Amino acid sequence: MSIQTDDFASSSPAARRVVSTAPASPNEEAIERALRPKGLADYVGQAKAREQLEIFIGAARKRSEALDHVLLFGPPGLGKTTLSHIIAAELGVNLRQTSGPVLEKPKDLAAILTNLERNDVLFIDEIHRLSPVVEEILYPALEDYQIDIMIGEGPAARSIKLELQPFTLIGATTRAGMLTNPLRDRFGIVARLEFYSVEELARIVTRSAGLLQVPTDTAGGLEIAKRSRGTPRIANRLLRRVRDYAQVKGDGRIDAAIADKALAMLDVDPQGFDVMDRKLLEAVIHRFDGGPVGLDNVAAAIGEESGTIEDVIEPYLIQQGYLQRTPRGRIATAAAYRHLGVLPPTTSGSELFDA
């Protein structure tokens, strides 16, 4: 018999990870919405971006103007969607939400733009995935609040100009480098979201535990925060799984001991690594002598797709200094050897830190 929770909906091992930064199901997305802060005062972390937005939003409200267009970029799970909702709420306007892949044709975007009210916010997630033809009609909308649309077909077709209400576009992306220069240049406010500190995540866990009515002491919240990989989405997911464990194996309260046992059951170690992380490091170290090793060889060794390794598993290991990408392939660092309890090689030690 197999068991699936709301967090384990896909057949791919990487997609089923409890430490995945992607929302796993509509049910999880609904829970995320319930846990979202409603205003900047409740928003934890991203101090620089929060301070800037407080000023820009306050100024726009005083002038009764639309806020400048906003680009939010950074790794997944850090709160770009949450921040877009907060911006709209702070401005006191409506929010219309869509995503780049959904806007397949110019008419799809035109239908949304023409229905926006004055100073409304349009949030486009994965904006780097807009098609070029859709992006083209977005330019005059952002600059002049106008769009040109074609009426009719064939020789009788003609272009008409439609005036739009002033609005704010919030674009979110995990890959800012994939944005075209003309699109990037049209954002007046650009904010990079960074990974959260353990202290910030502990505050988020404490707040979410309160909303979920789960008694959680400081040490228990801190234990969850330390294993959340700097990402609020993961912190809230781990909190819910630890809550389940506490209610079945304990008295319903979350302390450090209960959190540690629950996370050990989930195979999430003190560094926030799961089975897939350790599997990759073990393959590089034990099967390929620490590297360098090509991506395809690693993929074959652990039975995972190359794209999944590159986009889903590797980034956190690289960011934490356990793995390096070099022109010759992947190399395990000394930290990776220590984490697995293996002595680093002495003869090729210099390769561990090659760039």
Curated annotation (Swiss-Prot):
CDD domains in UniProt: AAA
InterPro entries named in the record: AAA+_ATPase, AAA_lid_4, DNA_helicase_Holl-junc_RuvB, P-loop_NTPase, RuvB-like_N, RuvB_C, WH-like_DNA-bd_sf, WH_DNA-bd_sf
Pfam families: AAA_lid_4 (PF17864), RuvB_C (PF05491), RuvB_N (PF05496)
GO CC annotations, alphabetized: cytoplasm; Holliday junction resolvase complex
Residues covered by region (Small ATPAse domain (RuvB-S)): 197-267
Cell compartment(s), UniProt: Cytoplasm
Binding site for DNA: 325, 330
Residue ranges with Low complexity bias: 9-22
Keyword DNA repair annotated: yes
Chain positions covered by the region annotation Disordered: 1-26
UniProt EC number: 3.6.4.-
Region (Head domain (RuvB-H)): 270-355
Function per UniProt: The RuvA-RuvB-RuvC complex processes Holliday junction (HJ) DNA during genetic recombination and DNA repair, while the RuvA-RuvB complex plays an important role in the rescue of blocked DNA replication forks via replication fork reversal (RFR). RuvA specifically binds to HJ cruciform DNA, conferring on it an open structure. The RuvB hexamer acts as an ATP-dependent pump, pulling dsDNA into and through the RuvAB complex. RuvB forms 2 homohexamers on either side of HJ DNA bound by 1 or 2 RuvA tetramers; 4 subunits per hexamer contact DNA at a time.
Subunit note: Homohexamer. Forms an RuvA(8)-RuvB(12)-Holliday junction (HJ) complex. HJ DNA is sandwiched between 2 RuvA tetramers; dsDNA enters through RuvA and exits via RuvB. An RuvB hexamer assembles on each DNA strand where it exits the tetramer. Each RuvB hexamer is contacted by two RuvA subunits (via domain III) on 2 adjacent RuvB subunits; this complex drives branch migration. In the full resolvosome a probable DNA-RuvA(4)-RuvB(12)-RuvC(2) complex forms which resolves the HJ.
Family statement drawn from the similarity comment of this UniProt entry: Belongs to the RuvB family.
UniProt-recorded name of the protein: Holliday junction branch migration complex subunit RuvB
Source organism of this protein record: Methylibium petroleiphilum (strain ATCC BAA-1232 / LMG 22953 / PM1)
